[in-house]
Regions:
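Phosphate-handling active-site elements
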Residues: 29-40
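Electropositive phosphate-/nucleotide-binding environments in soluble metabolic enzymes
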Residues: 19-23, 54, 154-157, 161
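Hydrophobic alpha-helical scaffolding
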Residues: 12-16, 46, 50, 153, ...
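Conserved phosphate/anionic-ligand binding catalytic regions in large, soluble enzymes, centered on
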Residues: 8-26
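C-terminal regulatory domains involved in ligand/effector binding and gene-expression control
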Residues: 69-166
Length: 166
């Protein structure tokens, strides 16, 4: 199972799929292409169709810099893997492509690539069913919250308190 930090996220709104994930993708792309002088981001399908209202462009431009980034909107083009597709391209000073990366906002602020494992989920729970977890609790004499703390670490409670307060 994934960490509770993935399920309960504090992030850039108003939409986890249309702002949090595109912003995260832009951040990852910038980290991979720090020497790029210009960027081009193509938004496809649902991201392009409703992106202005969800501020998808603002989420991306806040990371990549409005002055050196072009956003291309293709609301009628749906990529085969998922309706929330994005293509990032970086360019060097001579205009050559430094990287071409297609990534998808697959829900809840998470990113995915066709044919690859999810890019953002962290699998930290060794047991994947309530039956297995309850059996562990019975066997160890511990409570469910102790299982959570064992897998997540003691800092999970501070994180969940921050989510609650937000």
């Amino acid at each position: 199972m994934i960490t509770l930090k993935e399920l309960y996220r504090i992030g850039y709104g108003p939409s986890s799929s249309h702002t949090m994930a595109p912003r995260k993708a832009a951040t990852l792309f910038l980290e991979r292409n720090p020497k790029a002088v210009r960027f081009e981001v193509t938004l496809y399908g649902s991201l392009a169709a409703t992106g202005k209202g969800h501020m998808t462009d603002k989420a991306i431009l806040d990371v990549l810099d409005e002055l050196r980034t072009t956003i291309i909107w293709k609301p009628k083009t749906f990529l085969p893997y998922h309706p929330n597709g994005m293509k990032f391209q970086g360019f060097d000073a001579e205009g050559h492509i430094t990287e071409n990366w297609t990534v998808f906002s697959i829900g809840g602020g998470a990113l995915g690539e066709e044919g690859k494992q999810n890019l953002t989920f962290e699998e930290i729970y060794p047991m994947n069913s309530a039956t297995a977890i309850l059996a562990w609790c019975m066997h160890t004499g511990k409570s469910y919250w102790e299982y959570v703390e064992e897998c997540e670490g003691k800092d999970i409670w501070d994180y969940l308190a921050e989510v609650w307060n937000t």
